[in-house]
Amino acid sequence: MNIHEYQGKEIMKQYGISVPRSRITFTVEEAVQAAIDLGCEVIAVKAQIHAGGRGKAGGVKITRSLEETKSAAEAILDKILITKQTGPEGKVVNQVLIEEGLKIEKECYLSCAVDSTTSTVVLIGSPEGGMDIEEVAEKTPHKIFKESIDPAIGLQQYQARRLAFNMGINEACLQEAAQCIMNIYRLFMEKDCSMVEINPLITTEEHKVVALDCKVCFDDNSLCRHPEILKYRDLTEEDPREVQASKYDLSYISLSGNIGCMVNGAGLAMATMDMIDHFGGAPANFLDVGGGATAEKVKEAFKILISDKKVAGIFVNIFGGIMKCDVIATGILQAVNALDLDVPLVVRLEGTNVELGKEILKSSWLDVITVNSMAEGAEKIVALVNGKGVVRDERLN
């Protein structure tokens, strides 16, 4: 689960991490009043959306007067902000953070995440803050420093000090920076985060260490242990189809293609999308119904698929292990019948009760095409979508 920058900073304050004074606002009038109340010479007006790259897209503006603050808020609020992470459709900015400006001495980068290679938590630091860490890693990899953490003993003080030193923190701020790193790790572990990032982590002319910008993400599977985190969820920042899918324990991610995919298992889903791409098609989504899907779940999955107006065809690719193919077949027929499906549907079933499942589909009067392999199914749905009218007419005749 993603949260906004200002929410991440609220949590960081609970862990003793210094952040600038700020206030979240929803109107231009509120933004101006917040600037007055902060009483700072320099004010940052920052768009709050669930995406990075806001600064380069014009979503962060530095102002030095109330008139400039007002103009900046007017330019950002209720506008669509397009960054490299939002996609071409962008995101509407519903709120802006009004934040005090600080006198920056140095900018650094700091993050905490799980290293998929070693399956351990790793802290990443760099003296190059305020820019894309991917760009730093590509052009100057020697400026990226890592501290892998032994899960048996946790982060040690000497590791935090070493990372702070490698990040170029001056001696006057070294101890405070090391403590900040320790606090970030504690936040990461106690809140079951998937990532905590501060970019930039700054030192000020007053020798303070401050998180100027941050990103905090949580493991969805851990939210049952953290009801206090759920209050931060902003459904307006999420795809409505993804929200609906989560209600039925379905994993859904919207993509840019026009072929809807319904699969069980993340690995099979990835293979299915690759196969569709191989035959010249483009998947419209990643939809994993999981290992224990019921007929009701399948019906809801179809509702989500056809709610995407880009979908011109659907490929169902199911391997029945715990899940029985006859149950899936029944769910498919119920969904097609109830939803009046008007796009081509190709189904490949394999596994438990597969013959019974195929028989259920073939004996129905509904327009469902069954295939025997993933490759055959992918090729068929791509052909149907690319030559939709001709192919379907030939079949129906």
From Swiss-Prot:
It comes from Alkaliphilus metalliredigens (strain QYMF). ATP binds at K46, G53, R54, G55, E99, L102, E107. The gene is sucC. Residues 9-244 form the ATP-grasp domain. Belongs to the succinate/malate CoA ligase beta subunit family. This is Succinate--CoA ligase [ADP-forming] subunit beta. SUPFAM superfamilies: Glutathione synthetase ATP-binding domain-like (SSF56059), Succinyl-CoA synthetase domains (SSF52210). Succinyl-CoA synthetase functions in the citric acid cycle (TCA), coupling the hydrolysis of succinyl-CoA to the synthesis of either ATP or GTP and thus represents the only step of substrate-level phosphorylation in the TCA. The beta subunit provides nucleotide specificity of the enzyme and binds the substrate succinate, while the binding sites for coenzyme A and phosphate are found in the alpha subunit. The lineage of its organism: Bacteria, Bacillati, Bacillota, Clostridia, Peptostreptococcales. Its EC number is 6.2.1.5. GO terms for cellular component: cytosol; succinate-CoA ligase complex. One of its GO terms (biological process) is succinyl-CoA metabolic process.
